[in-house]
Amino acid sequence: MMPNTDVSSLSMLGQQTETAKSPEEAVLEKVPSNHAGTDYVVRFTAPEFTSLCPMTGQPDFAHIVIDYIPSEWLVESKSLKLFLHSFRNHGAFHEDCSIYIAKRIVELLDPKWLRIGAYWYPRGGIPIDVFWQTGKPPEGVWLPEQGVATYRGRG
């Protein structure tokens, strides 16, 4: 029998929800993991992430991959989607967006392990890729490659 997940504390799932005006205002929610004690990888992929250049206000685009090994909690996916969307009108450098996303999730979940790969499309002709992780993943966990090809342009 599948365990039931208590969703009574969630405020966004199943509700019409406004997008926060900034990442700082955005609410991330969590649900209990029914598999605490089992090491497995959860992956979220945001292939159309957008934010704004803090200098020019022009849009920046990235393909973001977040992998984590839960401890007691899982990030609720609608809240993550809205959190990521809150960057759409937010001006910040690529590195700041990428690391802020990862640290907010770590703060919320206290996962056993987390990594982020943020593959930014070129700005000024140079693609910027940002990688960060909390440490080494636990032994024996299947950790697939993130699968995002290096930017090649028309080459």
Curated annotation (Swiss-Prot):
Residues 1-20 have a biased composition (Polar residues). Substrate binds at V75, E76, S77, H94, E95. This is NADPH-dependent 7-cyano-7-deazaguanine reductase. It is found in: Cytoplasm. It comes from the Bacteria. GO terms for biological process: queuosine biosynthetic process; tRNA modification. It holds the Pfam family QueF. It catalyses: 7-aminomethyl-7-carbaguanine + 2 NADP(+) = 7-cyano-7-deazaguanine + 2 NADPH + 3 H(+). The keyword Kinase does not apply. It is an enzyme of class 1 (oxidoreductase). Coiled coil: none annotated. Belongs to the GTP cyclohydrolase I family. QueF type 1 subfamily. The keyword Cytoplasm applies. Pathway: tRNA modification; tRNA-queuosine biosynthesis. Keywords: Cytoplasm, NADP, Oxidoreductase, Queuosine biosynthesis. Catalyzes the NADPH-dependent reduction of 7-cyano-7-deazaguanine (preQ0) to 7-aminomethyl-7-deazaguanine (preQ1). InterPro entries: GTP-CH-I_C/QueF, NADPH_dep_7-cyano-7-deazaG_red, QueF, QueF_type1. The active site is at C53, D60. Residues 1-26 are annotated as: Disordered. GO terms for cellular component: cytoplasm. Its EC number is 1.7.1.13.
